[in-house]
From Swiss-Prot:
Keyword NADP in annotation: no
Taxonomic lineage of the native organism: Bacteria, Pseudomonadati, Spirochaetota, Spirochaetia, Leptospirales
Keyword Transit peptide: no
Recorded metabolic or biological pathway in which this protein acts: Cofactor biosynthesis; adenosylcobalamin biosynthesis; cob(II)yrinate a,c-diamide from sirohydrochlorin (anaerobic route): step 6/10
Annotated organism of origin: Leptospira borgpetersenii serovar Hardjo-bovis (strain JB197)
Protein name listed in UniProt: Cobalt-precorrin-5B C(1)-methyltransferase
Any GO BP: methylation
Length: 369
């Protein structure tokens, strides 16, 4: 039976970079820009249609409408708008305009007071502008990203709770939106595990996303490519299917946010469906001997990432190993069998932070082909 291929979408970050590049080209060429080709953070070339294209003296305003693909969220249809002015100075100054949130709490990887434009989109926006400036008499630019209606969109997110006030966040690590929360994606996870078993793969690596999959491949270079499965928010589905398909060993690889939810017993980890229980994280901290003042700081953290930063700053990375152990045990309970389940936590740059290994005697990480 054939299955419909999932249609990917594009992140707010990718659309912002495209809009900024279009505005830069408009300033340099002085001619309407109907479409713009950009390079996503994952190095893919994409052609975006440009909706708004307006020249006002030394300023250009262009916009790109976000298409979220087969997993539309509250930002689907958002008009990512870039207002650009070119400068002689060799730097890109990035500002947040109407509809883009401002960071008011620590722990998000962005300085307090800065617009909620994540590091990778910031880099992508700068790179696309500089690409256009090659060979021109300009060396930099002032860029303002705005999203009409962003404040209303933000009401459907957790932004306010996280201290992101005034609009949505400009996010995305690859530029691509994969439809992790659709029934179709769930079906694709099941299909991938069945295919792995068909090719006699006895160990599968369930990852929570593209970045963690890339890092997992570095951790296990000898495994077949079929072993690596992006389960997204459906780790629980991946585990249950692995049991049905007689997979001998499951390894879960993820980052602090998703694994913290799984340590709390949540097997459907979509960020809109559940939030990280920092009280639970503080209890884990106490269980491994982390002093009470630090445990309280962990409980009061804004995010799991913030909690991790607190542990790192105080030399208590040991919590990551305990989280991995709890995740592995929760996954084993979810499986309902004695199937071997291990867990690895990676940092945002791929560094291995902690692991809990549960290899059976018969399970071997066989060399891939």
């Amino acid at each position: 039976m054939s299955t419909k291929e999932l249609r990917e979408g594009f992140t707010t970050g990718a659309c912002s970079a495209a809009a900024a590049k279009a505005a830069t080209r408009l300033l340099l060429k002085g001619e309407p820009v109907l479409e713009i080709e950009t390079t996503l953070p994952n190095d893919r070339q994409v052609l975006f249609p440009v909706k708004r294209c307006q020249l006002e003296g030394e300023v250009a305003i262009c916009s790109v409408v976000k298409d979220a693909g087969d997993d539309p969220d509250c930002t689907h249809g958002a008009e990512l708008t870039a207002r650009v002015r070119l400068t002689k100075e060799s730097k890109i100054v990035l500002k947040g305009g109407d509809g883009v949130a401002t960071v008011t709490k620590t722990g998000l990887g962005i300085e307090v007071g800065e617009p909620a434009i994540n590091p990778i989109p910031r880099k992508n926006i700068s790179e696309m502008i500089l690409e256009e400036l090659k060979g021109s008499s300009f060396n930099g630019a002032e860029v303002e990203i705005s999203v009409p209606g962003g404040q209303e969109m933000a009401k459907k997110t957790m932004n306010k709770r996280l201290g992101l006030i005034g609009g949505i966040s400009i996010i995305g690590t690859t530029g691509i939106v994969k439809p992790f929360s659709t029934a179709a994606f769930k079906a694709s996870v099941i299909q991938a595990i069945r295919m792995a078993r068909e090719y006699e793969v006895d160990t599968v690596i369930l990852t929570t996303g593209g970045k963690s999959e890339k890092f997992a491949m570095n951790l296990f270079p000898n495994l077949k490519e079929l072993s690596f499965i992006q389960a997204g928010d459906f780790i629980g589905t991946g585990i249950k299917t692995s049991v049905k398909e007689f997979i001998r060993h499951v390894i879960v690889v993820g980052m602090i946010g998703k694994l913290s939810k799984m340590a709390d017993g949540v097997m459907m980890t979509h960020r809109g469906g559940s939030s990280v229980n920092t009280k639970m994280l503080s209890d884990i901290a106490r269980s491994v001997g982390i002093p009470e003042p630090i445990a309280i700081d962990i409980q009061n953290a804004n995010t799991a990432r913030h909690a991790l930063e607190i542990c790192k700053e105080n030399g208590y990375e040991i919590i990551t190993t305990k989280i991995c152990e709890i995740v592995a045990r929760n996954c084993s309970k979810h499986a309902g069998t004695n199937m071997s389940i291990s867990c690895y936590m990676v940092d945002f740059d791929g560094t291995l932070l902690g692991k809990f290994e549960n290899f059976s005697q018969k399970s071997k990480l066989r060399k891939g082909i």
